[in-house]
């Protein structure tokens, strides 16, 4: 699967789940479960409830995603 196939959306962290998983509400109102990307994990980027994030979704499963950026 190529990187161009991913859908990027903005969202807000609703709650923190175990194993660095998060419940994220997207701009369109959908709620997805997302995990942190490897680069964010490697650089110890902290994500807290209420943070604005960018989430990548695949067209195959729109209920799960990957957090790739935390807005300031």
Swiss-Prot record:
Residue ranges of every copy of the S1-like domain listed in the record: 1-72
Pfam families tied to this protein: eIF-1a
Tree of life domain: Bacteria
Gene Ontology annotations for the cellular component aspect, listed alphabetically: cytosol
Keyword set, alphabetical order: Cytoplasm, Initiation factor, Protein biosynthesis, RNA-binding, rRNA-binding
Gene3D superfamilies xrefs: Nucleic acid-binding proteins
Compartment(s) of residence: Cytoplasm
InterPro entries: NA-bd_OB-fold (IPR012340), RNA-binding_domain_S1_IF1 (IPR006196), S1_domain (IPR003029), TIF_IF1 (IPR004368)
RNA-binding found in the keyword field: yes
Main subcellular location: cytoplasm
One annotated GO molecular function: ribosome binding
Function per UniProt: One of the essential components for the initiation of protein synthesis. Stabilizes the binding of IF-2 and IF-3 on the 30S subunit to which N-formylmethionyl-tRNA(fMet) subsequently binds. Helps modulate mRNA selection, yielding the 30S pre-initiation complex (PIC). Upon addition of the 50S ribosomal subunit IF-1, IF-2 and IF-3 are released leaving the mature 70S translation initiation complex.
Protein family: Belongs to the IF-1 family.
Subunit structure: Component of the 30S ribosomal translation pre-initiation complex which assembles on the 30S ribosome in the order IF-2 and IF-3, IF-1 and N-formylmethionyl-tRNA(fMet); mRNA recruitment can occur at any time during PIC assembly.
Protein name in UniProt: Translation initiation factor IF-1
